């Protein structure tokens, strides 16, 4: 066997570039000496290149089509490829220790302390900073370790810990290096810690710290376990796919929105009014249980509704009310003004909700519309999706189902692109879609006219104050029409036979959205345009709040009935009578629109019932568990799986623009234009609710208190329309800049992918050149006769074409 030789590169190091990595120009001498290195490497044992040799095929194996055109590389080329840095990373601890020894030398040579972020945890040996050893017997590993330990002892504690932490070694090696590099003082401190030589105060301090840390971990684990979606979301995503999972994720988002809305209402309105309850105007009715359906009765005399809140300042002692029903402020103090608190709390709550909603929508847009290459995505899903930290059998089963469902969705999407529809089929599809839309719009118009007619009939009847069962008539009619129209739309979608299940869901969402928004528009006109005029001398705000409460309760009951009869009964009929193994599918469009409809009712009624977000939270929690149980027991996974990559963005967009924007317009009209009731509520003595802020500013100007800047702030920020336009422009600018940032990130991703592709082509070119050089040397050697045939080129798989990277395509 030939003796292994060592090549020492004598490249002088100047003082000007100490601590810096060599540039490509400075390493030209190193690259020029590669020819000598290749000649010496050719003398090594041939077994080092065995790992790149193709394995022999077994008896029953078949030749893969991709291996027929594989290049026949020589043994020398295989040995060179086997010694490449990318194939030797992590093999030689001596090389790693030698590399970090040179790094510590550079750290000590620097005049100033370096930035820790500049240290790259690479395992490739440097060709410039130490001798290139090809034989491990030249420098022993122990000698390298001792040199590294000496250099580590000369570093500061922070630099030493950071250097050892980033070494690509095992934990035992790192622990050994850290212990050997300790100073004598550090060793004594470590021995004292292990022997327990601590004072009583130190022991008490450490015990308290450990107890607090354990308590915090226990509280966090308890909060994590108390979440209803802790395990259910993974189970749903694994069994039913991302399309059904998007519904439950949207429900979780609505829970967060209502919780954020409820907190300021409880802190500044409900809690304060409950601490200072007003005197009852008459006898308070007893609780009968019917209030849970109608929202009237005993609930009318609680903090549930607008009429219970007082129109005076809340304090333990208050002077007689002056003009506008307000108490005069005492010297040097500003009492709690309930009308002002009611108005500003509602405004701040809606403004905060708007900001969070717009941010969530933009963030979801950036997450879902990122650049994703479909080339090799199936292989990545198969080989790179498993989480090896999962050890429990139940969790591993869920992860297995999730990967299987994800593969089905990817294959279904790929198969859909490979099967375009013919021209005749497209014309037929357009005609069927046109007829379907005409029927949907006609049914929507019919439902709207029916709701308007029935609401006029209800106006002609005497108002019952929301205490009888007859008050549930209008919510029942609206819920029946919504449910019947949704089933009609679903039947039309079945007849239309869409090629894409995503398009089918989007069509159903648009049709249900048009229906529900039209019905809600008629109801808003009924409440503010008709009911206010007929309820003169009564508290119309309480009536509107009770109506919205009844709509939420009846809608919740119909959702339960739909889960019971629409899913459970249909499953029993399909399995018992029809003898089919198929179960009904989960209707994503109708269930999502039910959530948006319920959230719109909450936003419409929060001004007249401050505790309506709490009712919505309870409603969503019940819906989560009921829908999950019904889904697991009565539904099956979609027969045509599809990847819901943009569904969260679509849901948040629909929640923002038609739902939240419409509710904001409704409430702004109620605050600025409609006269409040003169018998109840915090604005009973005012012409509009907005005048509460004007009256408060006027009182501050007359009082001449130290808060004289508040009237100026109210004038320029509230009454001046320029600030409103400026805030709207800033919000639109933030949305625009966020969209541009997302587009820029997608373009950068495209450029990086193109750069990676070019680097791969460069490496293929160099390998081909290296193979050609060895073939020429083999032919030129004496004593060998070989046909002068050109070696085959190392190439990529010819079946895959370069996929164009288009950053504008979602």
Swiss-Prot record:
Residues in the Cytoplasmic compartment per record: 227-253, 360-429, 490-504, 574-603, 671-721
Feature: compositional bias, Basic and acidic residues: 793-810
Membrane topology: Multi-pass membrane protein
Keyword Endoplasmic reticulum assigned: yes
Biased composition (Acidic residues): 15-26
Phosphoserine modification, residue list: 136
Keyword entries, A-Z: Endoplasmic reticulum, Glycoprotein, Membrane, Methylation, Phosphoprotein, Transmembrane, Transmembrane helix
Superkingdom of the source species: Eukaryota
Membrane spanning residue stretches: 206-226, 254-274, 339-359, 430-450, 469-489, 505-525, 553-573, 604-624, 650-670, 722-742
Residue positions, PTM Phosphothreonine: 88, 104
Residues with glycosylation annotation: 102, 311
Span list, region Disordered: 1-26, 775-810
Organs and tissues of expression: Widely expressed. Highly expressed in thymus, lung and spleen. Expressed in lymphocytes and peripheral lymphocytes. Expressed in small and medium dorsal root ganglion (DRG) neurons.
Family: Belongs to the TMC family.
Function, as annotated: Acts as a regulatory protein involved in the regulation of numerous cellular processes. Together with its homolog TMC8/EVER2, forms a complex with calcium-binding protein CIB1 in lymphocytes and keratynocytes where TMC6 and TMC8 stabilize CIB1 and reciprocally. Together with TMC8, also forms a complex with and activates zinc transporter ZNT1 at the ER membrane of keratynocytes, thereby facilitating zinc uptake into the ER. Down-regulates the activity of transcription factors induced by zinc and cytokines.
This protein's name: Transmembrane channel-like protein 6
Lineage: Eukaryota, Metazoa, Chordata, Craniata, Vertebrata
């Amino acid at each position: 066997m030939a003796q292994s030789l060592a090549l020492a590169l004598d490249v002088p190091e100047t003082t000007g570039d100490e601590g810096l990595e060599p540039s490509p120009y400075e390493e030209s001498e190193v690259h020029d000496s590669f020819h000598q290195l290749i000649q010496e490497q050719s003398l090594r044992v041939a077994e080092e290149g065995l790992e790149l040799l193709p394995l022999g095929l077994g008896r029953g194996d078949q030749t893969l089509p991709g291996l027929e055109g594989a290049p026949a590389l020589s043994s020398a080329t295989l040995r060179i490829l086997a010694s490449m840095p990318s194939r030797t990373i992590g093999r030689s601890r001596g090389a790693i220790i030698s590399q970090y020894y040179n790094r510590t030398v550079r750290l000590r040579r620097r005049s100033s302390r370096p930035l820790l972020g500049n240290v790259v945890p690479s395992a490739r040996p440097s060709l410039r900073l130490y001798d290139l050893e090809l034989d491990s017997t030249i420098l022993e590993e122990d000698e390298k370790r001792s040199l590294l330990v000496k250099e580590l002892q000369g570093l500061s504690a922070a630099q030493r810990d950071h250097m050892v932490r980033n070494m690509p070694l095992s934990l035992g090696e790192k622990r050994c290096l850290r212990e050997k590099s300790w100073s004598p003082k550090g060793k004594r401190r470590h021995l004292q810690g292990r022997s327990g030589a601590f004072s009583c105060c130190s022991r008490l301090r450490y015990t308290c710290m450990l107890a607090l840390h354990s308590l915090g971990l226990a509280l966090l684990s308890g909060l994590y376990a108390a979440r209803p979606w802790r395990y259910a979301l993974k189970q749903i995503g694994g069994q039913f796919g991302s399309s059904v999972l998007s519904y439950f994720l949207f429900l979780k988002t609505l829970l967060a929105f209502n919780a954020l809305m409820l907190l300021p209402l409880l802190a500044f309105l409900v809690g304060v009014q409950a601490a200072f309850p007003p005197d009852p105007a008459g006898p308070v009715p007893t609780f009968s249980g019917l209030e849970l359906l109608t929202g009237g009765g005993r609930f009318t005399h609680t903090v549930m509704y607008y009429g219970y809140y007082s129109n005076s300042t809340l304090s333990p002692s208050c002077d007689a009310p002056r003009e506008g029903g307000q108490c005069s402020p005492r010297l040097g103090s500003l009492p709690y003004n309930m009308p002002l608190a009611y108005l500003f709390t509602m405004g701040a709550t809606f403004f905060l909700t708007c900001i969070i909603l717009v941010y969530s929508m933009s963030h979801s847009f950036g997450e879902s519309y990122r650049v994703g290459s479909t080339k090799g995505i199936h292989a990545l899903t198969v080989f790179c999706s498993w989480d090896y930290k999962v050890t429990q059998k139940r969790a591993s089963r869920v992860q297995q189902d999730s990967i299987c469902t994800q593969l089905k969705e990817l294959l279904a999407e790929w198969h859909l692109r490979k099967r375009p529809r013919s021209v005749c089929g497209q014309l037929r599809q357009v005609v069927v879609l046109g007829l379907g839309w005409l029927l949907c719009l006609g049914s929507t118009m019919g439902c709207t006219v029916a709701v308007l007619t029935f609401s006029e009939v209800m106006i002609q009847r005497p108002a019952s104050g929301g205490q009888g069962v007859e008050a549930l008539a209008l919510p029942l009619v609206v819920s029946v029409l919504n449910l019947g129209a949704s089933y009609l739309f679903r039947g039309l979608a079945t007849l239309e036979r869409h090629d894409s299940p995503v398009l089918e869901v989007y069509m159903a969402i648009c049709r249900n959205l048009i229906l529900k928004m039209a019905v809600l528009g008629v109801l808003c006109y009924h409440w503010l345009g008709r009911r206010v005029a007929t309820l003169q001398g009564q508290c119309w705000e309480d009536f509107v709040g009770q109506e919205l409460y009844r709509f939420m309760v009846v809608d919740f009951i119909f959702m339960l009935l739909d889960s019971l009869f629409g899913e459970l009964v249909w499953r029993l009929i399909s399995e018992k009578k029809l003898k089919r193994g198929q179960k009904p599918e989960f209707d994503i469009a109708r269930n999502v629109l039910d959530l948006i409809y319920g959230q719109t009712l909450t936003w419409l009624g929060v001004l007249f019932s401050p505790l309506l977000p709490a009712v919505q939270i309870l409603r969503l929690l019940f819906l989560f568990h009921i829908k999950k149980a019904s889904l697991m027991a009565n539904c099956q996974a979609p027969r045509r799986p599809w990847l819901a990559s943009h569904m969260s963005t679509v849901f948040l967009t629909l929640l923002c623009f038609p739902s939240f924007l419409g509710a904001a317009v409704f409430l702004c009209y109620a605050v600025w234009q409609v006269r409040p009731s003169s018998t109840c509520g915090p604005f009973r003595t005012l012409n509009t609710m907005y005048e509460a802020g004007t009256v408060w500013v006027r009182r501050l100007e007359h009082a001449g208190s130290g808060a004289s800047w508040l009237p100026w702030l109210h004038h320029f920020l509230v009454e001046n329309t320029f600030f409103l336009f400026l805030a709207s422009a800033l919000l639109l600018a933030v949305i625009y800049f966020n969209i541009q940032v997302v587009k820029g990130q997608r373009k950068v991703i495209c450029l990086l992918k193109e750069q990676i592709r070019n680097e791969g082509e460069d490496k293929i070119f160099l390998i081909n050149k290296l193979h050609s050089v060895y073939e020429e040397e083999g032919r030129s050697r004496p004593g060998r006769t070989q046909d002068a045939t050109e070696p085959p080129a190392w190439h990529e798989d010819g079946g895959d074409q370069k996929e164009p990277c288009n950053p504008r395509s979602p």
